[in-house]
Amino acid sequence: MKTLYSLRRFYHVETLFNGTLALAGRDQETTGFAWWAGNARLINLSGKLLGAHVAHAGLIVFWAGAMNLFEVAHFVPEKPMYEQGLILLPHLATLGWGVGPGGEVIDTFPYFVSGVLHLISSAVLGFGGIYHALLGPETLEESFPFFGYVWKDRNKMTTILGIHLILLGIGAFLLVFKALYFGGVYDTWAPGGGDVRKITNLTLSPSVIFGYLLKSPFGGEGWIVSVDDLEDIIGGHVWLGSICIFGGIWHILTKPFAWARRALVWSGEAYLSYSLAALSVCGFIACCFVWFNNTAYPSEFYGPTGPEASQAQAFTFLVRDQRLGANVGSAQGPTGLGKYLMRSPTGEVIFGGETMRFWDLRAPWLEPLRGPNGLDLSRLKKDIQPWQERRSAEYMTHAPLGSLNSVGGVATEINAVNYVSPRSWLSTSHFVLGFFLFVGHLWHAGRARAAAAGFEKGIDRDFEPVLSMTPLN
């Protein structure tokens, strides 16, 4: 360790008992980071870091392909997807592959193709990762200057940012092209209970698209999570894709302005912290989106949302008791409010009882029964269709509640089934991942700022209390 420029810089790094453990320019002595610090050893080895990233991409794509094939192998077409613990097939079905009217799976072959394509891609990425980690050049700056970089080269960093933005924009347009030209996507709002359709009449009005961003995030408003038609979703992807591509070109062609050079920390760890913050925000938004939105995440595949299951229960018992002779328009509940129907604070007719808090819910099986002032009493008496009764009874018993041991549904509900909704899994996992990414952002941002300010060091070992204590033996 005597070759280090400054020992103090590494006081917080646990030293190895065997200082001879060397990894060809990636050992603790030359990098200041021990083996468990992972990619930190590769901060200045762009070629090896490329290998780590490509191999990581290979692992991700391998999981996608393997899990995809696993779900195909276990899939039972007669049961709804959300009863089978599937999290990948619902995404493929939402994109319009293999499904027909009502979300019924008519062909599992596209799912098989998807899994195989991902597996083959992962093999290519895996080979590239191993090549660059073990055989390729350690650094790219000399032999491939276009792919080389220095972390504090602000112009190069914004060029890399621009390339990433263009790739994200292309990704957004892939969804647009799928919806417009390549078979369409699944629309849960299609007449007659959902179907795959091409989205022709895109919403491109900036006041509508950016109006979502200006909405309140709270009940009844719901910010961007409140989007409930595919024209807006696909139109939003046109806007997003265009902004990403033009922003990417802008960042490639320009250098950072003086205020940005002053305001930001320009180091590898700082960029890591910015990325973690962005991913954290994405995780939290995805959590709310999959929990509340039944247009981007159709209930036919993901199961009902919480509010949807609750309103479905109120609807199911309204149907039952109306058949038994109850006057649902005037029956009084135990609190003195309407038992089946009541008015919201703004005057709409809504379901009564505990589900009143979910009066915002919009769902394809319920909307036909609404009039200009909320639920329409005459439609509730005359127009309820058998498919609406079946759908609501199914959703009532599949609430997205449940513990890890798969005792799903409302704890007191005798008709609940043994299942956990994919909505529960996807929203809780994205919340937890978003939280940990945020903690990682705080950690790396703190370290990056400290390093930039020049006071990055661990506990000061020179004046550590234990040094003045009597030896144990």
From Swiss-Prot:
Modified residues (Phosphothreonine): T15
Superkingdom of the source species: Eukaryota
InterPro entries: PS_antenna-like, PS_II_antenna-like_sf, PSII_PsbC, PSII_PsbC_sf
GO molecular function, one term: metal ion binding
Annotated localization: Plastid, Chloroplast thylakoid membrane
Cofactor comment text: Binds multiple chlorophylls and provides some of the ligands for the Ca-4Mn-5O cluster of the oxygen-evolving complex. It may also provide a ligand for a Cl- that is required for oxygen evolution. PSII binds additional chlorophylls, carotenoids and specific lipids.
Keyword Protein transport on entry: no
Major location (coarse): plastid
Pfam name, any one: PSII
PTM annotation (N-acetylthreonine): residues: T15
Membrane topology: Multi-pass membrane protein
Transmembrane segments: 69-93, 134-155, 178-200, 255-275, 291-312, 447-471
Biological process terms in GO annotation: photosynthetic electron transport in photosystem II
Swiss-Prot/TrEMBL keywords: Acetylation, Chlorophyll, Chloroplast, Chromophore, Manganese, Membrane, Metal-binding, Phosphoprotein, Photosynthesis, Photosystem II, Plastid, Thylakoid, Transmembrane, Transmembrane helix
Propeptide: 1-14
Family: Belongs to the PsbB/PsbC family. PsbC subfamily.
Self-association state and partner proteins as the record states: PSII is composed of 1 copy each of membrane proteins PsbA, PsbB, PsbC, PsbD, PsbE, PsbF, PsbH, PsbI, PsbJ, PsbK, PsbL, PsbM, PsbT, PsbX, PsbY, PsbZ, Psb30/Ycf12, at least 3 peripheral proteins of the oxygen-evolving complex and a large number of cofactors. It forms dimeric complexes.
Protein role: One of the components of the core complex of photosystem II (PSII). It binds chlorophyll and helps catalyze the primary light-induced photochemical processes of PSII. PSII is a light-driven water:plastoquinone oxidoreductase, using light energy to abstract electrons from H(2)O, generating O(2) and a proton gradient subsequently used for ATP formation.
Protein name as annotated: Photosystem II CP43 reaction center protein
